[in-house]
């Protein structure tokens, strides 16, 4: 699986679906990278923030549980959660099979963007 070239990535393996410059004041979609999904193994549960919650860039906002481990979920942006992907509730395989599409996790109306990398920078720092 390849990284989406038009997405931006955090060092904690989350992505947003737009550029940092375009994100401020807009709603962005957030998910985990295929690198994180591969390392986790089969995802069996996701505890996500709720609509109306405030998330902060670089801070935990949920957990992803797999057959191997439980990992914290970090927000790559600061803002208010506007939507949660209800389609993955009970169908967590989408996180593994299509992390950049059907496996998205939540949407945030962005107040501030955390430090993010281009696809090439993320790939280089993670040996992808």
Predicted regions and their residues:
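A short beta-strand motif that forms part of the nucleic acid-binding face
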Residues: 34, 68, 77
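Short, Lys/Arg- and Gly-enriched loop/turn segments at beta-strand edges
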Residues: 63-74, 91-94
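Charged, alpha-helix-enriched surfaces in structured cytosolic catalytic cores
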Residues: 76, 90, 117
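Conserved hydrophobic positions within beta-strands
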Residues: 13, 64, 73, 78-81
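Short, charged/polar surface micro-motifs in flexible loops or helix N-caps
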Residues: 37-38, 78-81, 87-88
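Acidic, low-complexity mobile loops and tails
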Residues: 1-60, 93-128
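Residue-level recognition of beta-strand microenvironments
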Residues: 16-19, 67, 84-87
């Amino acid at each position: 699986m390849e990284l989406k070239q038009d997405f931006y990535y955090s060092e904690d393996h989350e992505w947003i679906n737009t550029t940092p410059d375009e994100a401020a004041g807009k709603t962005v979609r957030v998910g985990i990278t295929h690198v994180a999904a591969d390392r986790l193994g089969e995802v069996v549960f996701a505890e996500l923030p709720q609509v109306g919650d405030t998330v902060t860039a670089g801070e935990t906002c949920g957990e992803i549980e797999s057959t191997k481990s439980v990992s914290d979920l970090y927000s790559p942006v600061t803002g208010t959660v506007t939507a949660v992907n209800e389609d993955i509730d009970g169908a967590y395989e989408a996180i593994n099979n299509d992390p950049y599409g059907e496996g998205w996790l939540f949407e945030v109306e962005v107040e501030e963007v955390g430090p993010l990398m281009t696809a090439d920078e993320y790939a280089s720092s993670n040996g992808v």
